[in-house]
């Protein structure tokens, strides 16, 4: 297991590389170029600037999250081939810079969804919440306004405002795209990009849909064991893998997280993992909690044991944390609670490892 920590760069993050460097066990950061418009080529020189900044702090840059997929590719428009060519060029540039894994998603319009970015918990901390009843009662425009107000000026990944300016137009285009068509468009993309990944030795890791069900009538296709396996078999290459986000998949209690880790892990298709916990509050509703098992609805001991059982040697990061101790930061991405999560993950891993050596 290689423990990493997401970082949004000097321009966009309240957390510094010096602070990340002091978290025990963290080897590197998960980064991106947030100022490059979606669909454009990431310049090699800009990638190297980011890498040099990270390495100067004593950390590694081997995972990118995310190289976003242009909406025209998801929609299957005639213009998609140009954007796919740009994506391939970006992968080649990342490979030249030593990047090993690229995370991406294939969610239409919204990369992720929450209805409250600042839910107050009884202990005074703030967290993010999803209440499906609120989704059913608002328009997409109203929700975007609510999220923008709740972002407190931070740029939220997947919610870049320039991408959402043409919201109504984009929704109109998706009226002709159901789950089967979206899946076909994903396969079209992978069939052209994966050969470049094989050539460059860069693993492509799709992020599950967050949450793993349809919102506003938009199709969702990476939500459970069955459709993930279908995607992997459609383009059957070890370079076509997944970012196993237990929080996204775990929002559906029907997804058996430890079993899925073992299944896809034995296939060698988990290239990157996000670990966090959440608390169910109703059907299709939850809020995010601190990482320990007793704080949420998932048993993180069993989750980490599943990773250990498959001999996982890939990258793993603590996912969203609460805002605690008065910290002002991007929702879900403050320093303190994620640092606590990192040490909890590391502690579970050490305990599981030593238990096996002692009793097996």
Curated annotation (Swiss-Prot):
One of its GO terms (biological process) is D-glucuronate catabolic process. It is an enzyme of class 4 (lyase). Keywords: Iron, Lyase, Manganese. InterPro entries: Man_deHydtase, Xyl_isomerase-like_sf. Pathway: Carbohydrate metabolism; pentose and glucuronate interconversion. It catalyses: D-mannonate = 2-dehydro-3-deoxy-D-gluconate + H2O. Gene3D superfamilies: Divalent-metal-dependent TIM barrel enzymes. One of its GO terms (molecular function) is manganese ion binding. Coiled coil: none annotated. Its EC number is 4.2.1.8. Its cofactor is Fe(2+); Mn(2+). The keyword Glycoprotein does not apply. Catalyzes the dehydration of D-mannonate. Belongs to the mannonate dehydratase family. HAMAP family: UxuA. This is Mannonate dehydratase.
């Amino acid at each position: 297991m290689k423990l990493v920590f997401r970082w949004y760069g000097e321009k966009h993050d309240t957390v510094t590389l010096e602070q990340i460097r002091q978290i025990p066990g963290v080897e590197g950061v998960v980064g991106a170029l947030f100022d490059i418009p979606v669909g454009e080529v990431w310049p090699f020189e800009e990638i190297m600037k980011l890498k040099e900044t990270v390495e100067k702090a004593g950390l590694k840059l081997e995972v990118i999250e995310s190289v976003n997929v242009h909406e025209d590719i998801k929609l299957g428009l005639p213009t998609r081939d140009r954007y796919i060519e740009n994506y391939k060029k970006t992968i080649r540039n990342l490979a030249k810079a030593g990047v090993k894994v690229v995370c991406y998603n294939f969610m239409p319009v919204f990369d992720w969804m929450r209805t409250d970015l600042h839910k107050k918990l009884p202990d005074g901390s703030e967290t993010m919440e999803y209440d499906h009843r609120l989704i059913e009662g608002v328009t997409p425009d109203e929700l975007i306004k609510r999220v923008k107000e709740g972002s407190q000026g931070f740029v939220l990944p997947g919610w870049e405002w320039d991408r959402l300016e043409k919201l109504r137009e984009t929704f109109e285009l998706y009226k002709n795209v159901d789950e089967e068509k979206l899946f076909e468009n994903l396969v079209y993309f992978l069939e052209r990009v994966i050969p470049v990944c094989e050539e460059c030795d860069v693993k492509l890791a799709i992020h599950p849909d967050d949450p793993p069900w349809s919102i506003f009538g938009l199709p969702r296709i990476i939500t459970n064991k069955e459709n993930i396996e279908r995607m992997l078999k459609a383009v059957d290459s070890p370079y076509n893998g997944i970012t196993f986000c237990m929080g996204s998949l775990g929002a559906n209690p029907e997804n058996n997280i430890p079993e899925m880790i073992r299944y896809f892990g034995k296939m060698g298709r988990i290239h990157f993992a996000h670990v966090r916990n959440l608390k169910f509050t109703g059907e299709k509703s939850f809020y995010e909690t601190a990482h320990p098992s007793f704080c949420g609805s998932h048993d993180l001991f069993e989750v980490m044991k599943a990773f250990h059982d498959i001999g996982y040697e890939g990258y793993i990061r603590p996912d969203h944390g609460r805002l605690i101790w008065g910290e002002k930061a991007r929702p879900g991405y403050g320093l303190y609670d994620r640092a606590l999560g990192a040490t909890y993950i590391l502690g579970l891993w050490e305990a599981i490892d030593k238990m096996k050596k002692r009793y097996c």
